[in-house]
A protein has these predicted regions:
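N-terminal beta1-alpha1 ligand-phosphate binding loop
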Residues: 4-19
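Short glycine-aspartate micro-motif
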Residues: 4-8, 53-57, 102, 125-130
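Short glycine-rich anion-binding loops that position phosphate/pyrophosphate groups of nucleotides
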Residues: 12, 61-64, 132-134
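Hydrophobic "anchor" residues
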Residues: 13, 25, 71, 76, ...
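Glycine/GP-enriched mid-protein hinge/lid loop-to-helix segment characteristic of carbohydrate kinases
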Residues: 17-20, 27-30, 37-38, 94-96, ...
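Residue-level structural signal for beta-strand termini and adjacent loop
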Residues: 19, 30-32, 70, 77, ...
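N-terminal phosphate-binding loop and adjacent alpha-helix
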Residues: 22-52, 70-72
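Glycine-rich phosphate-binding loop and adjoining helix at the ATP-binding site
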Residues: 41, 64-125
Length: 168
């Protein structure tokens, strides 16, 4: 049976998984440290090459180009992550597996996961905010991830330190 593949491409690690159905538990997962682009992507390609895929979804740190038809669609663009600027993330997977590849931000992927399988079940709209390697957010309204000009860019949130905060 051809499987569904998923990549959560984070600034610290890539989590790759395969499952039979969208709501089924993963059959296999792997955690790959996010090092240099070629090394990290090659390790992910190697993981998926052991499985027959019917589709793949990638949720990535960014900024990324989500404009289908753009010459840089599927790229991680002007990221502060060292060595990852202008990295084609989608292309290597499309070329290797010749299956449909979905692509979105890591926080939009997490927001969609919460809506369908987590704390947002039963809702049709939500905002998801994460604090991890960076700060980001994704928003869903009427069951649809918000993209384009109306996308609320939540990744540029200044955090001012309180003078009494001794956290180092």
């Amino acid at each position: 049976m051809a499987l569904l593949g998923a990549v959560e491409a984070g600034g610290t690690k890539f989590i790759c998984a395969v499952a039979e159905q969208p709501d089924a538990p993963p059959i296999e997962t792997i955690s790959i440290p996010t090092t240099m682009p070629a090394e990290t992507i090659d390790r992910a390609l190697d993981f998926f090459s052991r499985h027959e895929l019917r589709a793949l979804g990638i949720a990535s740190f960014g900024p990324i180009d989500l404009r289908v038809g753009s010459p840089s669609y599927g790229y991680i663009t002007a990221t502060p992550k060292a060595h990852w600027q202008n990295t084609d993330l989608v292309g290597p997977f499309q070329q290797a597996f010749n299956v449909p590849v979905g692509f979105d931000t890591d926080v939009n992927g997490a927001a969609l996961g919460e809506l369908r399988y987590g704390g947002g079940q039963g809702l049709d709209s939500l905002v998801y905010v994460t604090v991890g390697t960076g700060i980001g957010g994704g928003a869903i309204t009427n069951g649809q991830v918000i993209h384009g000009l109306i996308h609320p860019e939540m990744g540029h949130i200044p955090v001012r330190r309180h003078p009494a905060d001794t956290f180092a």
